[in-house]
Amino acid sequence: MKYTFVTISLALAAPAAFAQTSVSLYGIIDLDGQYLSGHAKQLLVTSGGQSGSRIGFKGSEDLGSGYYADFVLEGGINVDTGGSAQGGQLFGRQAFGALRTPFGTASAGRQYSSVYIQSSSEFSEFSNVGIGATTAVIGGFAGGYEPIRGSANNTATSTATGSELNGSPARVNNSFRYITPVFEGFKASFLYGAGEIAGQTNQQRLYDYSLRYTNDSLDAMVSYVDDKATNGGAPANLQTKVGITTASAAYTFGSFKLEGGYLALNDKRPANLDGKGFWLGGDYRQGQNVFRAQWVQNKPEHTTVGKTNAYGLGYEFDFSKRTDLYTSLTRFSNGGTGLGRIGSSVPTGLTVAGDTSVTEFALGVRHSF
């Protein structure tokens, strides 16, 4: 349910012309319990198993002649603790204003990147957060760079610390985006993220180019992100100079849906710590029941860390259009040195060197309004 407040005013200078403004309050509350079994056992209550918990405001004003002024202010919530997500930022998920016109849409603020969109539930069975064989498994390249969770590195537009969807290239601060009108199912997008450091316009910035095609059954997208932050004097492993190529697609036929994607990170620093990620999944819907499965692989290159394979099965029961119960069983098979990867940060003690694989069982409920 969306709570909508509408104001309609009469434009006296233009008879029979109306300007309509609407503001909506919306959100998602998603809570789950997890049982993790690796070198040790752990029970968790977490927020955002299927979708990141959030509360937001969005509005639109019809300016006439096909022009609209829009805004979105959306903050993440850790429902298990009552705190704010995304490093404590008030509107850490999205915060932007936009002008939609017959010639395309221009927007500015904190916005999703093409990498975030392609790794989300639009193209993945387990989205890019939370439980299951999530695309958040992919990352840890180039000395710790996280292309899907959000990087803790000194990236051009990241202001928060930590690696849980805080900064670029997942969400891009100080960014401008232009999206073309749709033509024969195609639309293109360009995003620029400014580092906002005087004298370092080309040293602190992010470019994001994408192309998307959509028809009744197929949704496909390709993109390239150039993220660069080489601010003077920072250690090499805390600097960023990477290119990220991503391709994803979702195809629906009857009650079945098949989706997957590919991500390749090119580390342009001398260390050359490249990485690749793959995912392939599908679901089958029967009435209120949804059965899903997905495989995700994370493959760091030029390192001994080793690859991760995640195999996940999931089930969802829709009580209504706004509330569902979900469960999943996932195996994270980790190789190489290090402590391995799961869909989020690995809890201390869950894995140790030589014993890095983890089994996860989750049960949760999601409600949207």
Region annotations inferred by a language model:
Residues 1-19:
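Gram-negative bacterial Sec-dependent N-terminal signal peptides
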Residues 21-35, 43-195, 203-205, 212-216:
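Outer membrane beta-barrel
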Residues 23-31, 65, 69-73, 106, ...:
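Transmembrane beta-strands of outer-membrane beta-barrel proteins
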Residues 40-44, 83, 162-163, 195, ...:
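Extracellular loop and loop/strand-boundary signature of outer-membrane beta-barrel proteins
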Residues 46-52, 88-90, 167-171, 200-206, ...:
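Transmembrane beta-barrel outer-membrane domains
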Residues 58-62, 100-102, 179-184, 212-216, ...:
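Structural signature of outer-membrane beta-barrel channels/translocons
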Residues 207-318, 328-331:
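Detector for outer-membrane/organellar transmembrane beta-barrel domains
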Residues 353-369:
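Outer-membrane beta-barrel "beta-signal"
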